[in-house]
């Protein structure tokens, strides 16, 4: 059996743009993608901390070092520049590997720079 497990997360990213007329997806600074091992065209879930909206889309590489987090297409209706979002990527893990799998979590500042890397979350942690 396989389970769907959280394998990567960009925590408290700041939306830099919302582009309604783009084809679709989310554009993410490639440095941030690399930090948590998210690849172009991979499916992600986005949770908007400001309004509670949740959506799924795929990733497009953004310029390295730019800090870009841009929601494109229909997703642009669910965010505003400045909103705080959590970008989560899941993967299928075989039952025998459940306890060996450790996610990569990057906690970001207001400029989408990594301030901390976590390997796991602990209950009651407030960031």
Swiss-Prot record:
It catalyses: L-aspartate + H(+) = beta-alanine + CO2. Its EC number is 4.1.1.11. InterPro entries: Asp_de-COase-like_dom_sf (IPR009010), Asp_decarbox (IPR003190). It is found in: Cytoplasm. Gene3D superfamilies: 2.40.40.20. Its cofactor is pyruvate. One of its GO terms (biological process) is pantothenate biosynthetic process. Is synthesized initially as an inactive proenzyme, which is activated by self-cleavage at a specific serine bond to produce a beta-subunit with a hydroxyl group at its C-terminus and an alpha-subunit with a pyruvoyl group at its N-terminus. Signal peptide: none annotated. Its main location: cytoplasm. Pfam families: Asp_decarbox. SUPFAM superfamilies: ADC-like. Binds 1 pyruvoyl group covalently per subunit. The active site is at residues 25, 58. Heterooctamer of four alpha and four beta subunits. Belongs to the PanD family. Catalyzes the pyruvoyl-dependent decarboxylation of aspartate to produce beta-alanine. This is Aspartate 1-decarboxylase. It comes from Bacillus cereus (strain ATCC 10987 / NRS 248). The lineage of its organism: Bacteria, Bacillati, Bacillota, Bacilli, Bacillales.
């Amino acid at each position: 059996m396989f389970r769907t497990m959280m394998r990567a997360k960009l925590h408290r990213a700041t939306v830099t743009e919302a582009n309604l007329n783009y084809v679709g997806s989310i554009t993410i600074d490639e440095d941030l993608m690399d930090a948590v091992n998210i690849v172009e065209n991979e499916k992600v879930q986005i949770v908007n901390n400001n309004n509670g909206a949740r959506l799924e889309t795929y990733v497009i590489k953004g310029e390295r070092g730019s800090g870009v987090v841009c929601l494109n297409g229909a997703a642009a209706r669910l965010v505003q520049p400045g909103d705080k979002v959590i970008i989560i990527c899941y993967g299928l893990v075989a039952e025998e590997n459940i306890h060996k799998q450790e996610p990569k979590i990057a906690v970001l500042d207001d400029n989408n720079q990594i301030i901390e890397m976590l390997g796991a979350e602990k209950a009651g942690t407030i960031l």
